[in-house]
Amino acid sequence: MIQPQTLLKVADNSGAKEIMCIRVLGGSKRKFGNISDVIVASVKSATPGGVVKKGEVVKAVIVRSAKGLRRADGSYIKFDENAAVIIKDDKQPRGTRIFGPVARELRDKEFNKILSLAPEVL
């Protein structure tokens, strides 16, 4: 469950290391986001020479959540950390590599490029 002020690890090589959620997109009363939801975030720490800089406001999609997610078959998927991938406006990732596993639920919202770059899809 991701809400404003939540810190997330960045799971790509766009240059950002950590981002903080500013807003969960998808309605004015939306308070929480889960896996495959798009958020607006601020870059809190970044590597030198990266594509994104510290303080930049970016869009990101949540790929891992410590809260977990219930699937249609009744099973749950849960990760050790909260992580996101920084995206462009056309749902394409800004980085060229994805680190760590991502959830299969990204396919429902058509983040196919992220799924193809990920080393493991759970």
From Swiss-Prot:
- Asked if the record carries the keyword rRNA-binding, the reply is yes
GO cellular component terms, A-Z:
cytosolic large ribosomal subunit
UniProt xrefs under Pfam families: Ribosomal_L14 (PF00238)
Cite a single GO BP annotation.
Answer: translation
Which key words tag this protein in UniProt? Ribonucleoprotein, Ribosomal protein, RNA-binding, rRNA-binding
What Gene Ontology molecular-function terms does this entry list? large ribosomal subunit rRNA binding; structural constituent of ribosome
Q: Does the keyword Ribosomal protein apply?
A: yes
Q: Which CDD domains match?
A: Ribosomal_uL14 (cd00337)
**What protein family is recorded?**
Belongs to the universal ribosomal protein uL14 family.
HAMAP family cross-referenced by the UniProt entry: Ribosomal_uL14
Function statement: Binds to 23S rRNA. Forms part of two intersubunit bridges in the 70S ribosome.
- Assembly: Part of the 50S ribosomal subunit. Forms a cluster with proteins L3 and L19. In the 70S ribosome, L14 and L19 interact and together make contacts with the 16S rRNA in bridges B5 and B8.
Its name, as the record gives it, is Large ribosomal subunit protein uL14
Q: What is the phylogenetic placement of the source species in the record?
A: Bacteria, Bacillati, Bacillota, Clostridia, Eubacteriales
